[in-house]
Amino acid sequence: MAEDHDYSQSNVPQEQRRGFWAMFVVMLGFTFFSASMWTGTTLGNGLTVSKFFLAVLLGNLILGAYTSALAYMASSTGLSVHLLARRSFGKRGSALPSAILAIPQIGWFGVGVAMCAFPIVTYLKEKGIECNIWIPVIISGILFTTSAYFGIKALTIVSLVAVPAIAIGGGFSALKVFCDNPDAWNTLKNFTPTGDNALTLSAAVALTIGSFISGGTCTPDFVRFAKDRKIAVSTTAIAFFIGNSLMFLFGAVGGMFYKTNDISNVLVAQGLLIPGIIVLTFNIWTTNDNALYTSGLGLANITGFPKKYLVLICGTLGTIFAVTLYNNFCGYLNILNTFIPPVGAILMADFFVVRRKNIKSNAVPGNGKPAILAWAIGTLVANFVQYGFKAINGMIVAFIFYVYFVKVFGGLKEAEAPAEEAPAEAAQPSNDEEAKKEEVK
């Protein structure tokens, strides 16, 4: 079997860990998400400018705290979200969260391929060039699959090119809005939402959180490559504040002045066709290759097959069904995404509460019942309780019930951790040094 450079079945060894900038561009590219621009348009049309910035700030504070906690766990262990799930759901039981995480990501990959292809066909048609939709679909699918196939190094290279391109293109476009519209700031400052568009602050914060909390659960798949906890947590927190906030801002400005929710369409409306296509492609690319990478890791945990071959299969399926997924599957994918946040809450409960005295323990419970029951209850609450923030409601309930059920059912007291089944312990010298200091004390 070929060497697994993505460590889909084990922890990332210390010598393969990466520094701040390599991790930062990957995480920033991860947060450059087109769906966040759609949410930004909704927020921009539904809030005053002061409440818009407050909602984005509060929402990203919560998202940043959640993803930073997952980043801390990943860098401490060197494990992907799927291998972290083994520690609470058990080896067989971890197939459940892996499937919940992997299947929507394959679907979103297909949607992203179509999202890239349709505007390109439209742009070319406006220039008098007829193009069959399957040409950009196939090209996009191959591009996005290739970087996911080659793993974290390829994801880093794509992000190194894409992140500056998106930031410069979006920043220039926003600046052009104010240059072309002298009263733009007054328009923003004096804007008052009316009718069905108006949002309460709590609803706006819920939208901000909901736009990325499911994707954010996959954070460990990337930051497990960070050299230490400080790099993992800081790059994650900063990326969510900068990347997510920029996407909301671009969406709000585009929606208000150009009646579109995507910065690439704004660039085209401003007469910048080629930059628009470039920004569109890069913006979707940095999200899609990450989605496919995560789905490959999830299926590798379920099947035991190498991640890179599973990425090829998932990428091929997503490309073939891209148009169908785009037209019929978005609503279904959004429903599936409500199943994901309770998984992250259970992983945190296991790491910070159940294993708090021995976070390096890779004991795999012989009985995954506590995690499965807690996930089921958290998912039901997230879907049917209408008060507060749905995703957070589900997470809080799943967290509490997991800790409770571990006490009721015995949890790790029934653990079995054969070396060939349990994920290997992460090699992190800084952790060992801390442990020695504690022993001396």
How should each PLM-predicted stretch be described?
Residues 14-17, 344-419:
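C-terminal membrane-solvent junction of multi-pass transporters and transport-like membrane proteins
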Residues 26-30, 98-99, 113, 125-150, ...:
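Transmembrane alpha-helical segments of multi-pass small-molecule transport proteins
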Residues 117, 135, 139-177, 236-240, ...:
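Membrane-interface loop-to-helix entry segments
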Residues 56-89, 98-104, 110, 407-415:
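Juxtamembrane transmembrane-helix boundary signature
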